[in-house]
C-alpha cells in the first residue's frame, strides 16, 4: 500500500505542528501538506520542518481554492481554530472554515476527514453556562453536525482542555468518563496529535465516530481496540 498523503488545515497551531512532525516521521505517510495562512508560515514549514506547504487562508479562500490545495491528497485533518482571537473568527474559522473544508473534500472526492472539536460539544446543557466558551461551543457543535451530515468518512475527535505537557500515550476509557467531571478533563496536545495519526491508520475503528479524548490510564492501542 502506498503511503497516505495527508493535508493538515491549521498546521501552524500547537496540535497542528505536533501532527505534522509525527506524520513526517511515520513511514505510513507521504510528506504531509501544511495548509497555513501566511507566507512566513509557508517558509517555516518548507525550510525548517521540511514538508510541503500551501498558502491557503481558509477564512478568506473560496471552496474552489481550498479544493485546489487539497485535491492531490488522500485525507484531510482539520485542526484550525480562532485561538482566542475574537468571536468573529470563531465563526469564520472554527465553524465556516470547517464547513468550507468539508465542502472542498466532497468536491475533490476526498473521503477521509478528521476534525478536532471539543469535549461534549453536542451537549448544550454541559457548555451553555460556561463563561466565555458559549460561542466557541456553538461553533464546534454546529461544525460537527455539518461533518456528520456530509458524505465523508469522518472522525470527530472531542478532546478535553488542551495541555502542553509531553504526551503519555494513555487515555481515559470512554465508559469511565464521569459526566460531572468533564469540565475538568484535560489531554496533552501531543496525545491528540498521536491519536489523529492512529485514527488515520485505523479507519475501521474510527470512521463515522465521535470520540472523546482525555488523558487516563489506558494505552492508546487498547483504547482504539475498544471503539
Swiss-Prot record:
User: Does the keyword field hold Translocase?
Assistant: no
Localization (cell): Cytoplasm
Q: Which CDD domains match?
A: SDR_a5 (cd05243)
Q: Isomerase: present as a keyword of the record?
A: no
Where is it mainly found? cytoplasm
Which keywords does this Swiss-Prot/TrEMBL entry list?
Cytoplasm
What would be one Gene Ontology cellular-component term for the protein?
Answer: cytoplasm
Q: Which InterPro entries match?
A: NAD(P)-bd_dom, NAD(P)-bd_dom_sf
- Give the highest taxon in the source lineage: Eukaryota
Gene3D superfamilies in the record, alphabetically?
A: NAD(P)-binding Rossmann-like Domain
Q: What else is known?
A: Present with 704 molecules/cell in log phase SD medium.
Q: Note the PANTHER family from the entry.
A: FLAVIN REDUCTASE-RELATED, UPF0659 PROTEIN YMR090W
Q: Which family does it belong to?
A: Belongs to the UPF0659 family.
Q: What is this protein called?
A: UPF0659 protein YMR090W
Protein's organism: Saccharomyces cerevisiae (strain ATCC 204508 / S288c) (Baker's yeast)
Amino acid at each position: 500500500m502506498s503511503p497516505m498523503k495527508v493535508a493538515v488545515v491549521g498546521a501552524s497551531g500547537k496540535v497542528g505542528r505536533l501532527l505534522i512532525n509525527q506524520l513526517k516521521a511515520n513511514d505510513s505517510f507521504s510528506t504531509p501538506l501544511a495548509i497555513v495562512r501566511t507566507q512566513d508560515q509557508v517558509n517555516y514549514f518548507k525550510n525548517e520542518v521540511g514538508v510541503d506547504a500551501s498558502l491557503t487562508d481558509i477564512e478568506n479562500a473560496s471552496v474552489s481554492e481550498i479544493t485546489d490545495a487539497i485535491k492531490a491528497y488522500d485525507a484531510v485533518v482539520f485542526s484550525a481554530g480562532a485561538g482566542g482571537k475574537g468571536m468573529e473568527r470563531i465563526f469564520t474559522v472554527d465553524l465556516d472554515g470547517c464547513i468550507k473544508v468539508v465542502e472542498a473534500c466532497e468536491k475533490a472526492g476526498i473521503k477521509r476527514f478528521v476534525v478536532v472539536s471539543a469535549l461534549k460539544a453536542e451537549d448544550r446543557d454541559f457548555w451553555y453556562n460556561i463563561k466565555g466558551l458559549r460561542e466557541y461551543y456553538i461553533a464546534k457543535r454546529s461544525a460537527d453536525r455539518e461533518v456528520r451530515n456530509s458524505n465523508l468518512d469522518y472522525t470527530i475527535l472531542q478532546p478535553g482542555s488542551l495541555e502542553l505537557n509531553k504526551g503519555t500515550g494513555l487515555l481515559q476509557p470512554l465508559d469511565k468518563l464521569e459526566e460531572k467531571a468533564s469540565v475538568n478533563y484535560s489531554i496533552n496536545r501531543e496525545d491528540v496529535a498521536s491519536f489523529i495519526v492512529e485514527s488515520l491508520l485505523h479507519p475501521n475503528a474510527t470512521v463515522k465516530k465521535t470520540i472523546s479524548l482525555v488523558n487516563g490510564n489506558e494505552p492508546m492501542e487498547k483504547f482504539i481496540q475498544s471503539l
